[in-house]
A protein has these predicted regions:
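Core beta-strand-centered patch of the WYL/Sm-like small regulatory domain
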Residues: 1-70
Length: 70
């Protein structure tokens, strides 16, 4: 499976490493319950939680890591 790994700060301020399926990525401008105010969002399957999650692009820390590009 092709995955994208990044460091992310969630709405509670907790920082963790996240892994998502690159084939499930949907990037859009909008607002959702956990990310108030219109902004760029990325929805994707979180491989560790085995469920779709929405990430605020502004809360991604540092660089992305793609497992299939080495």
């Amino acid at each position: 499976m092709n995955e994208l790994t990044f460091t992310y700060k969630n709405w509670k301020g907790e920082i963790s490493e996240r892994r998502i399926d690159v084939h499930s990525i949907n990037i859009y401008y909008g607002e959702v319950e956990w990310h108030e105010g219109e902004q760029w969002l990325m929805e994707a399957i979180d491989l560790d939680k085995n469920d779709f999650r929405t990430f605020a692009i502004k809360d991604i820390i540092g660089e992305f890591s793609l497992d299939f590009i080495k």
